Each structure stands twice: as structure tokens, then as C-alpha cells.
Amino acid sequence: MAHCLAAVSSFSPSAVRRRLSSQVANVVSSRSSVSFHSRQMSFVSISSRPSSLRFKICCAAMGEAQAKKETVDKVCMIVKKQLAVPDGTPVTAESKFSELGADSLDTVEIVMGLEEEFNITVDETSAQDIATVQDAANLIEKLVTEKTA
């Protein structure tokens, strides 16, 4: 496909779009999944389903950003519950467990709550590296990704 981009660089924008469209169609028809990447962090994946000729288009960067926010929100909820954080006390991604009053036993209980909520297993070494809500969310995202891979 790279040679096609070089060949169409001197055409008008509409000619380039037509040429790329036909190339994309050819690539998609020969593969079950194709991803397009740009420098602007807007990744698009096109997957064909074997049982139908329809295509599934998703914006991966947006999906990942949303998943991280959802993960952080769930971690905040679990931390608030485990530490009995008073209403009105903000718990954000940057919140440190120790600043919220957590001791080592509280941290173990938080990790157990995270394991239950996300259906993951956190090893002891990784659990000791968790100091903030964001640390926990990053570890969860990593473990969930590894589990589904």
C-alpha cells in the first residue's frame, strides 16, 4: 500500500481519495482486520466478520481513553468504600492511598476489592508498587489486557 501512496501523491485530492478507497477495499477483502494509524492519535480499525460481509469500525484511541476513565472511576469507588472516605472528600487518579489514611492492611483490602471487581489476580510485588489510584488503574488495564490476549 505504501507504493500506492507514492504513486498518487501528484493527483488531486479527489483522485487520491478514490485511489485509496479502492486500495483499502482490496486490503480489507484479503484480511480479517486492518488498522490505520496517524500522528494525531486517531486510530481506526476495520474488522470483517466471517459470518457477514459487514464491517466493524471503531476508534481505538477513544475506546482506550474511555476504558481508562471507567477503570479510574471504579478504582476511586472501591477506594472510597474500603477506606470509608467521607462524602465530599475528592478521590482522583492522583490520590495517594496513604494520604487518604490507608495503612498496609487497607491497601491489601483495596487490592482484594480490585481483584474481585475486575476478575484479576495481582501478585504481591505488583501490589506493593501501587501507591495511587492511577497506579492501580494502570496495573488493572495491563492485567486485563494480558488476560484477554
UniProtKB/Swiss-Prot annotation:
Q: What Pfam families does the entry give?
A: PP-binding
What the entry lists under InterPro entries is as follows: ACP, ACP-like_sf, ACP_chloroplastic, PKS_PP-bd, PP-bd_ACP, Ppantetheine_attach_site
Q: In the database record, which residues form the transit peptide?
A: 1-59
What one GO molecular function would you report for this record?
phosphopantetheine binding
GO cellular component terms, alphabetically, are: chloroplast
Residue ranges constituting the Carrier domain according to the UniProt record: 69-144
Localization of this protein: Plastid, Chloroplast
- Matching SUPFAM superfamilies, A to Z? ACP-like (SSF47336)
Q: Does the keyword Transit peptide apply?
A: yes
- Where is coiled-coil annotated? none
Write out the function statement from the record.
Carrier of the growing fatty acid chain in fatty acid biosynthesis.
Cross-referenced NCBIfam families:
acyl_carrier, PRK00982.1-2
Q: List the protein's name.
A: Acyl carrier protein 1, chloroplastic
